[in-house]
Curated annotation (Swiss-Prot):
Family matches, as PANTHER family: L-2-HYDROXYGLUTARATE DEHYDROGENASE, MITOCHONDRIAL
Enzyme class, UniProt record, top EC level: oxidoreductase
UniProt EC number: 1.1.5.4
Originating species: Prochlorococcus marinus (strain MIT 9515)
GO biological process: tricarboxylic acid cycle
Pathway, per record: Carbohydrate metabolism; tricarboxylic acid cycle; oxaloacetate from (S)-malate (quinone route): step 1/1
Cofactor: FAD
Pfam name, any one: Mqo
Keyword Transcription regulation annotated: no
Key words of the record: FAD, Flavoprotein, Oxidoreductase, Tricarboxylic acid cycle
Catalytic activity: (S)-malate + a quinone = a quinol + oxaloacetate
Name of this protein: Probable malate:quinone oxidoreductase
Gene of this entry: mqo
């Protein structure tokens, strides 16, 4: 993809977005729809957009709606199911669906290029896990968001849903599964490019590839000055607002900003690998995303899943992820990334997390040294008939988990977190899952806290509501609103229950 040249001799912008992945793409899309007069620049170190964390093989492509991800509904100390996170994620994902429906109906993006509907299944074995899944099903179906969820402990029924997970399995095994037909597989790489292709038609939007951020600092007149490298030269740019959405590298850029809010953060890099199958006789038999339950005490990234994926018009099966450790913060990053992030204000927190999470470090090490045979043995827990010759190993993307300094020392946080400068002039996105699936909700919050929208916030709410078609459904109670929102999204996006 080509870059637009800088058109303003003074190199002044209303907003500069660092990184051309799904997060920056979503924010840029919202900005151009809500505030089309803004002069926006997106800079990307690589030659093409969406090729790091958003890359098709660098993530699972799951439209995270908490349909099947059991780690989103943990048990509390009293054995009660905690559902708040699942509800929040589901509602956030519906906002993403609403935006896509809005853009597709106005012919601004083509959803057929990046979105496929596919059932989301939770599958467990053993009495304890079956009991948990029953409890989860009963609790979740009390809510409108999950009323269409199905439960079965019938071996034959589960076989009809996902035959590969029961083939060669003992039919006397205690098993259970839930299914939500309205699941999705999403190619976030293609979605990112759809966004950028559309917004690049706006004369106020510029996108520059092979462009790297070297430094950024606040000037005396409260603007940001960014020093970048492009086309073999260094250029200084000025802007009122900066968004740092560069995946794992964001932590390094955030530290360069020297905002007080950045001083409590560090990053813990986690790599990943997939087992991939292209064998047609297998890919045609599996049409679902099947998530299992992680072992007690295991980190969230250890949740195993067997996914149907469509990438560049071809169907694949992916199993994993198998975690690992590297000092890189990006797949195409530097082995110095972790060391460059160590500062005097986060070093003790980083060391504290290392001491407290010795089990995690051991887990990552054990995952890193697994043989192909051992990885296939893991796969057989989900797919007993797996043949090693049908599967090959491929690197997934890098994730940098958040380390945050607290009164009790360093804390390792899984998930996504927004860091905002007090004056709203800079925002940074840290962390990982559910990330891309909830990008619309996350970027709406970024927009609300930014300095870009100086009018009454209620006007911003109205603009967002209009963009997401939610204004058409106002004055309805919560359940009716959600039901009609889903019906409208289903109709436009092509899901037929």
């Amino acid at each position: 993809m080509t870059s637009k040249k800088f058109s303003d001799k003074k190199n002044n912008y209303d907003a500069i977005l660092v990184g051309a992945g799904i997060m920056s793409g979503t924010l840029a899309l919202l900005l151009t729809e809500i505030l089309p007069e803004l002069k926006i620049l997106i800079i990307e170190k690589l030659k093409i957009p969406g090729s790091e964390s958003s890359g098709a093989f660098n993530n699972a492509g799951t439209g995270h709606a908490a349909n099947c991800e059991l780690n989103y509904t943990p048990l509390d100390d009293y054995g009660h199911l905690k559902i708040e996170k699942a509800l929040s994620i589901n509602r956030s994902f519906e906002k993403s669906m609403s935006l896509w429906a809005s853009l597709y109906s106005s012919q601004k993006i083509d959803i057929k290029k990046f979105l496929k509907f596919i059932p989301h299944i939770s599958f467990v074995t053993g009495s304890e896990n079956v009991s948990f899944l029953k409890k989860r099903f009963k609790k979740m179906t009390e809510y409108k968001e999950f009323e269409d969820m199905e439960f079965s402990s019938s071996f034959n029924q589960i076989s009809s849903w996902a035959p590969l997970i029961t083939k060669s399995r003992n039919p006397l095994d205690e098993v259970a599964a839930t299914r939500v037909k309205r699941g999705t597989d999403i190619n976030f790489e293609v979605l990112t490019r759809e966004y950028l292709k559309y917004i690049s038609k706006n004369k106020n939007v510029e996108i520059s590839y092979e462009t790297e951020l070297n430094d950024l600092k606040k000037t005396s007149n409260k603007e940001w000055e960014l020093n970048i490298s492009m086309e073999g030269r260094k250029v200084n740019l000025k802007t009122s607002y900066v968004f740092l959405g560069a995946g794992g590298k964001t932590i390094n850029y955030l530290q360069k900003s020297n905002i007080p809010e950045a001083k409590v953060y560090g990053g813990f890099p986690v790599s990943g690998k997939w087992l991939i199958c292209e064998e047609n006789s297998l890919t045609e038999k599996h049409n679902a995303k099947v998530y299992g339950r992680a072992d007690i005490g295991s980190p969230p990234m250890s949740v195993p899943h067997l996914d149907t994926r469509w990438i560049e018009g071809k169907k694949f099966l992916l199993y994993g992820p198998f975690a690992g450790f590297t000092t890189k913060f990006l797949k195409q990053g530097s082995y110095l990334d972790l060391f460059n992030s160590l500062k005097k204000n986060n070093l003790l927190s980083m060391l504290d997390v290392g001491i407290k999470n010795n089990d995690l470090i051991n887990y990552l090490f054990s995952q890193s040294i697994k043989s192909h045979k051992s990885r296939v043995e893991n796969l057989r827990n989900m797919m007993p008939s797996a043949d090693p010759s049908n599967w090959y190993l491929e690197n997934a993307g890098q994730r940098v988990q958040i380390i945050k300094k607290t009164k009790k020392g360093g804390s390792l946080k899984f998930g996504t977190e927004i860091v905002n400068a007090a004056d709203g002039s800079l925002s940074a996105l840290l962390g990982a899952s559910p990330g891309a699936s909830t990008a619309v909700s996350i970027m709406i919050e970024v927009l609300k806290k930014s300095c870009l929208f100086t009018l009454d916030k209620s006007i911003l709410e109205q603009k967002i509501s209009h963009l997401l078609y939610e204004s058409e459904l106002k004055n309805q109670n919560e359940n009716d609103f959600l039901e009609n929102l889903k019906k409208r999204n289903n109709s436009i996006l092509g899901f037929h229950p």
